[in-house]
């Protein structure tokens, strides 16, 4: 095959994929119903609906952080609920109990089994931020850090959330 003919064949093979990195297919109805179910379970477990709040899940070199805030800064009751929730999950995670995320997501969340096994080497520190709270998760144990990153990656994906750096700041 000549070089020009080879280019035409190659372009013909690549044409269907050109631009595919630019567009994201719409979620399937099943994915949307699964997302809706997760949001409904989350509203019960977390005490605040996902549509009224924003989540950020950041990987950091020594672990990560969860930032959870109300979209409406005037919703002080919601902010109080978030603060109580993040402190509660920090306390639960510290003793190896990850029932909250399992209940919200309907599965054992990736990373949590290893985080439970390595709980003695993981620190959890919650503090208030405007309209919500942040839970900082840190460790010096590389296996624990990998588990924390797996946990946070799943959270970003399932909540359709960005990292904190890309969150909308009201």
Predicted feature residues:
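Bacterial N-terminal signal peptides
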Residues: 7-17
């Amino acid at each position: 095959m000549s070089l020009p003919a080879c280019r035409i064949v190659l372009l013909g093979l690549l044409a269907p994929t050109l631009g595919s990195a630019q567009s994201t297919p719409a979620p399937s109805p099943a994915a949307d119903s699964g997302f809706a179910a997760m949001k409904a379970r989350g509203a019960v477990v977390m005490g605040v609906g996902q549509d009224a709040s924003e989540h950020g899940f950041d990987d950091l070199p020594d672990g990560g952080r969860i930032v959870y805030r109300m979209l409406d800064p005037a919703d002080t009751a919601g902010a109080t609920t978030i603060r109580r929730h993040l402190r509660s999950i920090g306390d639960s995670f510290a003793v190896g109990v990850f029932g909250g995320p399992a209940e919200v997501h309907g599965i054992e969340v990736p990373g949590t089994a290893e985080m439970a096994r390595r709980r003695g080497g993981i620190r959890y520190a919650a503090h208030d931020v405007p309209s919500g709270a942040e839970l900082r998760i840190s460790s010096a144990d590389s296996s624990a850090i990998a588990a924390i990153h797996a946990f946070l990656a799943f959270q970003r994906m399932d909540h359709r959330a960005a990292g904190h750096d890309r969150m909308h700041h009201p």
